[in-house]
Regions:
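Short, flexible active-site loop motifs that bind/organize anionic cofactors or intermediates
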Residues: 6-9, 40, 93
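Intrinsically disordered, low-complexity boundary segments flanking structured domains
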Residues: 14-17, 66-68
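Short, aromatic-enriched amphipathic alpha-helices that serve as compact interaction elements
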Residues: 1-15
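Hydrophobic pocket/interface hotspot
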Residues: 7, 19-20, 27, 46, ...
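Soluble or luminal CAZymes and related metallo-dependent hydrolases
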Residues: 3, 49, 87
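A beta-strand edge to alpha-helix "cap/lid" segment located at domain peripheries
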Residues: 55-111
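A solvent-exposed, acidic/Ser-Thr-rich amphipathic alpha-helical stretch
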Residues: 24-68
Length: 111
């Protein structure tokens, strides 16, 4: 599986540990799609921050956020629908930087 396929798989399973392991030690996830659901932009730096935040996000959500309509354009870009608090948000995730087979920076934008 590509890094993005693994990312989507971890998000669908709610596996915060495996999700964090996809990133470099100082990897970044920047997600502004959450604005469309009335939440603040999510900007996390480092594997530990990613694991801890998603542990809490999956916990408070009662499990993983539903993801559907997944369309991969290449190894760096995927579009999908994610549901936050009952609101379906179309998004694009882009692998901006990779290093040693890990994600160095992942940007997620609303469509």
């Amino acid at each position: 599986m590509t890094l993005l396929e693994q990312y989507i798989d971890c998000m669908q399973k709610g596996d915060c540990v495996a999700l964090a392991d996809l990133f470099t030690d100082h990897g970044v996830i920047h997600d502004s799609s959450t604005i469309k659901a009335g939440m603040d932009t999510l900007h996390l730096e480092g594997k530990m921050a990613i694991e801890m935040m998603f542990h809490h996000k999956f916990g408070f959500n009662g499990g993983p956020f539903p993801i559907s309509g997944i369309r991969y354009f290449d190894e760096r870009i995927v579009w999908y629908f994610i549901t936050y608090n009952g609101k379906v948000v179309p998004v694009m995730a882009t692998l901006s930087e990779m290093e040693d087979g890990k994600i160095k920076r992942l940007n997620i934008y609303p469509l």
